[in-house]
């Protein structure tokens, strides 16, 4: 059911107190109401994202809310009446058993009201903080129920304007977008009005037109540092540029353009004129991210970007000198304007990658797609540009059971298990930060790793080894159980303060010292030679964007590929993931978490996605590792077959063989539909007897996003005839009716261990003649 024309009075809230899985099954058996959220018609299992699972992975009781739209007012009133009868009597007349089964799982059934409008994670706390801190005017963002009718949108906006002015406030800005079905207004009102909203008495909080009320100016994925991080360091970098047209854009804070690590390497585009009031000392996040994007970790710098970096400031500093989205700007509107300018202006239309190291701590992903994520999804498909987005930071104390003495006495493996189980138990409060749930973007989590030299601990402890998931990184998964984050990369080692009394509670507090290692060394204000050591998923994201720019140049040099320009971003996305595997990280993490079966796969992918990318594996072939790349467009209900020729040297050969296949694409979206992802592409290898065992990620979860990455292995000696191929069938399944042609890139690598000394490359090269067979 498309809900773009929702009548606000038709939205029901179901508070679940029983089994979520049982509730979903019972709800599906009753006609007349539909999900607002993500239930998209595919078979579901209990999901630990909105249901607690016991040690066996089974659904157990947890209070949760779901939102439904009734098909008509009469049905709505009947359902409310039945709920009241059930509450009063606990039983029904004959024929109403399905309702009894449904109600047995519920704590409450009611209309959408003022409770729900402030019910998103952390919103109430942030508004309370604003109401206390501000003595005069407070800005809040009101998100309205979207209507496909422009007349209804205007009427709803007028009603909010009237109520705002009656409360002594004023309208600051408004934004409507039909493509993502979003309608929002920023108002300025008194702190007293905000307090009345929190109490549920303000007319604005009771208005049927309102879906959500939120604080403004929140979005930034803050780096983990102290306030006086900078130290001086002189660097001598190669300043030669191969090309001036940018491949990568950075949407972030204003950078320190005259820093020695950034000088003559940036194109700063500031159409809003924010630079004038952006003090040099406050230009922290943008300077650090630009530094990482251009040079990587300065502890062991990479070859710098060969093209200029385009920078568009989307942050300003507030009165407390914090970098954030301005409180008078609707962030979705700012994103839309910034990306449209990048992709349509001559100076930056060469951009293929947009780095977005941001995360809204008041928008944790639970079920529904945030408007920011919807905007990224729409923009990526419309402009064929890859957004690389940080998963989000959750830097918090570790409240571990027992005393510090008992924790300290344990072996490191036991300490790791305690820490990761503690973080996993708090998963609900550590999920992705918007817009990281975007299905088209590449979402990056962080590993506890950097290139810093061994450092003096100086009252700090490092309880986990390098290249394990960082304790601050957000935990996935994504929309409709897709793999999120997509991958992980070095984000910097975060240490904790030593506890000097063994009898004290084992509460590990973060060390925010940034003037010395560990951490990634970055350019930092206020001076042209200042540096700092920082940590965060922002850092990991910037490093992956650097790798993406490197891959653009690699792809351009592949002979005979003939990749259309509108497929470059999709190819980069696929190649970044193609080199990923769980490896030792996955093994150690699973030992810490102690999960098994499908829960093992899901838990690991929620932490590290498909793993850490190894660019060396994808940038070139060897005699024992051969990568083939295919591309094209596909439409609904179509199949395309790619032939991967098998070398004769593997015929009846007993050795470990690995086949890695990655399919990447961008999907158009149904922004307010239970089937959000319109293009459901997938691949299936046929005739793959030599590597018939799936490894790592769950084979169902990999099909729920816009990148399917699978690893197949085998050791058996399998006979086959000369000229045999593995058929890789790419299909586009039917979701909702879809008229768009979907561009995609398919990457396949067959390999054996180098010591096998088999001539895979030569034999495949001799046979290669990529042919595609189209089936409709």
Give residue ranges: language-model regions.
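Autoinhibitory propeptides
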Residues: 1-13, 25-138, 158-238
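C-terminal edge strands of extracellular/lumenal beta-sandwich accessory domains
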Residues: 677-690, 718-776
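Secreted peptidase-domain scaffold signal
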Residues: 594-678, 682
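Extended low-complexity, serine/threonine- and proline-enriched intrinsically disordered segments
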Residues: 8-50, 140-144, 151-168, 657-706
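Subtilisin-like serine protease catalytic core
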Residues: 236-270, 275-330, 363-365, 384, ...
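Catalytic-core environment of secreted peptidases
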Residues: 253-272, 447-461, 468-541, 558
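Substrate-binding/access-modulating region of protease and related hydrolase catalytic domains
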Residues: 155, 318-438, 528-535, 539-541
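Structured lumen-facing ectodomains of secretory-pathway proteins
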Residues: 209-211, 393-493, 497-503
